[in-house]
Swiss-Prot record:
Keyword annotations of the record: Cytoplasm, Lyase, Schiff base
Enzyme kind, highest EC tier: lyase
SUPFAM superfamilies documented for this protein: Aldolase
An annotated GO cellular component: cytoplasm
Gene: deoC
Pathway: Carbohydrate degradation; 2-deoxy-D-ribose 1-phosphate degradation; D-glyceraldehyde 3-phosphate and acetaldehyde from 2-deoxy-alpha-D-ribose 1-phosphate: step 2/2
PANTHER family: DEOXYRIBOSE-PHOSPHATE ALDOLASE
Protein name: Deoxyribose-phosphate aldolase
One annotated GO molecular function: deoxyribose-phosphate aldolase activity
NCBIfam families reported in the protein's UniProt record: deoC
Cell location: Cytoplasm
């Protein structure tokens, strides 16, 4: 597989304009990235600009804090799907994970899974806030809840993906779901290391630089 085929070309900043999203979509078409990952308000525009291409439209849910109710997440995900999203990247309720309430975390994931049975569901566990044991448990709970992918990070926390975290999560997943590394994938070497550790998708705002052999200094 080419590096481009791993990449969710991402722009989730609050300052993103419609023109920025159009550029993102044009870059995704040009480089044959797997998907664009954008905020929900831009879904219809991205759908139109990507028409006729193989690039998927991914969006976020409960982002970036995960601190809304499961019902709100389910509604947000369903509306995004109805608007044209192919993939949903949801954030778990991090507070429940830190409190050890894994039943609540799993119920949260299941609520979104039920709301969008046809969409690819990626579950963000926000590794920067978790111990290794919590990362293992969060990964397992996400898979049990119906995740198609478990994702390391929002890119808005205190840290992003690390090779060690990707390797740990991959061991827990054991091939039952995909694994998306996001945040901190800045060079082709970073990308390759994440893939070798077990990542099957990469979230980055610097995909063009990665496939061109350069560096992504954008931070996501």
């Amino acid at each position: 597989m080419s590096l481009a085929s791993y990449i969710d070309h991402t722009l989730l900043k609050a300052t993103a304009t419609l023109a920025d999203i159009r550029t993102l979509c044009e870059e995704a078409r040009e480089h044959s990235f797997y998907a664009v990952c954008i905020n929900p308000v831009f879904i219809p525009h991205a759908r139109a600009w990507l028409e006729g291409s193989d690039v998927k439209v991914a969006t976020v849910c409960g982002f970036p804090l995960g601190a809304i109710s499961s019902e709100q997440k389910a509604l947000e995900a369903r509306l995004s799907a109805e608007t044209g999203a192919d993939e949903i990247d949801m954030v778990i309720h991090i507070g429940s994970a830190l409190a050890g309430d894994w039943d609540a975390v799993e119920a949260d994931v299941r609520a979104v899974r039920r709301a969008v049975p046809e969409q690819v569901l990626k579950v963000i566990i926000e590794t920067c806030y978790l111990t290794d044991e919590q990362k293992r448990l969060a990964t397992e709970v996400a898979v049990q809840g119906g995740a198609d992918f478990v994702k390391t990070s929002t890119g808005f926390g205190t840290g992003g993906a690390t090779v060690d975290d990707v390797r740990l999560m991959a061991e827990v997943i054991g091939g039952r779901a995909g694994l998306k590394a996001a945040g901190g994938v800045r060079t082709p070497a970073d990308a390759q290391a994440m893939i070798e550790a077990g990542a099957t998708r990469l979230g980055t705002s610097g995909g063009v630089g990665l496939v061109s052999g350069g560096e992504n200094g954008a931070g996501y």
